[in-house]
Amino acid sequence: MQTTVQSGESLLRDLPRQIVQRGAKAGAGDIVGGVEVEKRRMVRFSNNVVTVVQTWDITSPIIYLGFGTRSIASRLSDTSTAAVDESIQQMLPAVNALPETVESHIPRGPFQYKNVPGLFDSKVPRLEAELMDMVESAINASLAEGAKRVSGVLTSYHTRKSLYTSTGVDASTELTMVEVSLRSFAEDDASGQGVSVSTSLKDFDPEGAGRESGSFAKQSLHPGQGHEGKHNVVFGPSIFANLLNTVAFSASAYAIDAGYSFFADKLGQKVGSEQVTLVDDRLRPAGPGAIPFDDEGHPSQTNNLVAKGTFETVSHDSRTAAKLKTRSTGNATWFSDIGQIVPIPTCLVLDEGDRSREDLFEEAGDGLYITNNWYTRFQNYRTGDFSTIPRDAMFLIRNGKLGPPVKGLRVSDNMIHILQSTRAVSRGRKWMRWWEVDIPTYLGHVLVDRVGITRSTG
Amino acid sequence: MANTYMKPGDQTFDELIGDIRHGVYLKTFMEWNIDDKRFNERYVGHEAYLIENGELTSYVRNPVLELTTPKLYSSVDAVSKEMEFDAGTCGKGDPMQGAPVYEGGPSVRLRNIRLGGGA
């Protein structure tokens, strides 16, 4: 067997075509050949000093084979044609073992893709020592606000992606992103988080993230024990982005089909208050997560997932669309958690309101301000019952003003209730993405009435 | 901690529940989380049964165990000698890495624990 190893531009141009040729020879009717080339540079830091600097060069060929009523996809780390051949030979018996579903076909191209401005910044791939300077500026800004210890991670991404299909798609794109997430401590139980995410350097603000993180840490000194009950809660962008990620996943036809959605059977119904409009805007200029085409070559769209509280769009790829007799929404995405191409929103935007954060405190009257969280886990995916743990800065709201810091509480509620009880959304949005926010989300602060808050019983 | 479990005791499972007049057996759980100091933790039973006079009787829906770590471990008064394990993956990062873990251990009896749910 002859094997060819390629690199650089020829890899991006030729390998997808070679995958399609080999897939056709294997008898597949619909074939997608793709390749993603990513350079990732990461600087980790803890206790105010850089601890790890690492660079990854990740090249990932993607193979999709469709046989009408069955399909299979695979992502490789080897770019040789021999590896492609071997993978296809392994995929054939696997796809034949799958149960048949409704017949579906990948989108028929060619397509004219929209030019989405601001997704690539030529300065980002060249960042090297500057990344260390950015980390230093973030740490120093946090310390200047009163933090004693600062830790986190700053990462730059440069991704080139090309796609070729048996149905006439020939697409390529180049994307950049740079992000920092840091956590500052003023004492062991006084911490704050700061995040900055951008596709370009001009909107990237590590110093601002450091300031925010350090300021929250300082304000959180000497927290008291919070109380369980039903509280009006102002959610900061980080925690609410985490919750909206679960909303986006629930809007996926894959999640609905698999029984993992609290939106099942709710299309066209009110699932939230009038204040909630959540868009999957894959065409958003300079949007982290935006991209002109999906992993089947379908042009990306701007989809209203929830519009003024109504569940308006189920995210589809061609397979789920055929099953539900509708059209793809251009959301086919390789989902590494399950090793398949499934429909997933990738660029979330929450409509902004006209109030400031302080206006929301005033409207809340008495309640809580929660800035960050981790460990959102569902008790029941279908009903949306869940809990999540606030971490870092959390405060009482008293008489409409920011009050003293508190700790030891848990949000234990239901996602439909959260959406339906959303009373107000602030103006002044920012992009969020970090460990607990996988899908980049653009949002501000959000006031939700009577949120379930619990604490340990002993 | 890839392979951490509680040391087994000397009772069978039947002996463990045999002298419980009124209790709950949490066999598996669904929702769970823990704070970053590993102090406050919560588990919501998935497959769970009522224990009445030493017997498993009816199914219990979504019992919530929400307590501190010291309370959990100080409430243990018996541990079974049988152990069960499953293979699992623990997420580590950043960036995300899946660490293989071996998870399980013996059945554990806690006394005078409050089960609840909701706010």
For each of these PLM feature ranges, what is it?
Chain B
Residues 1-119:
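N-terminal small-residue-enriched
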